[in-house]
């Protein structure tokens, strides 16, 4: 269930110009075992990537700034996943779970996508993480948090407020990107008018805003900005349509 592109298909059918239809945004907080976005997105995002860390099973080490933009993180995840489904492991500790929102972990734990462990060694064994470098990486990360200085990926650590990965029990989950937002769509102008693919002029009476329109955000949209996009161009479209109706 979800978006079916019905409006986009109809608009293209009457001659709307397409723009960047092959550009998709991937959400880097998803789990490969859950259907769709599943129930673990908030846990992976806010507990593991905002506060905790993400590691490559094969190396046991971090490989990205967990605070980077969605595209940067998704690209880094895809590179690690590769062709052999080497899903990275996102993890955090008990102090983090209680500091953010304990409800974020409740349902994923019940469903079994988030796993809980008494020790980091148990976590490494379960997810088949390269144990020795992993344990060293956690200690190094904790040192970075204390110093508020990530020497590897320059992540801003002041937002951790001292929270690291040291208080048992520990939580881990596989993570992967999944399609989240269609960056492309129909071409519009600043008046939210849809542009014709044939005449390159506005199609009379046809307005668009939000995800159905393309060319607004480029290749990667900032989180939550889709709402502002839809509201802004929706208001513009309403004003333009009302003005057009008065002239009719």
Segments and roles (model prediction):
Residues 1-248:
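Residues forming the flavin
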């Amino acid at each position: 269930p979800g978006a079916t592109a019905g409006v986009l298909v109809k608009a293209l059918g009457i001659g709307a110009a397409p723009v960047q239809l092959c550009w998709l945004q991937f959400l880097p907080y998803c789990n490969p075992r859950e259907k769709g976005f599943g129930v673990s997105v908030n846990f992976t995002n806010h507990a593991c990537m905002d506060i905790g860390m993400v590691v490559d099973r094969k190396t046991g080490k971090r490989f990205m700034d967990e605070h980077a933009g969605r595209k940067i993180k998704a690209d880094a995840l895809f590179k690690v996943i590769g062709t052999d489904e080497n899903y990275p492991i996102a993890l955090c500790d008990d102090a983090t779970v209680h500091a953010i929102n304990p409800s974020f972990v409740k349902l994923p734990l019940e469903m079994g996508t988030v796993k809980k462990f008494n020790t980091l060694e148990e976590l490494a064994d379960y997810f088949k993480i390269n144990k020795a470098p992993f344990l060293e990486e956690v200690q190094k990360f904790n040192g970075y948090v204390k110093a508020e200085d990530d020497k590897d990926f320059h992540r801003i650590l002041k937002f951790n407020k001292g929270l690291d990965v040291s208080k048992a029990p520990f939580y881990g989950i596989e993570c992967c990107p999944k399609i989240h937002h269609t960056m492309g769509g129909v071409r519009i102008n600043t008046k939210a008018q849809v542009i014709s693919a044939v005449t390159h002029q506005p199609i009379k009476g046809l307005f668009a805003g939000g995800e159905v329109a393309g060319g607004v955000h480029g290749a990667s949209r900032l989180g939550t900005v889709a709402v502002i996009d839809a509201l802004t161009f929706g208001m513009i479209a309403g004003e333009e349509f009302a003005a057009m109706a008065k002239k009719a």
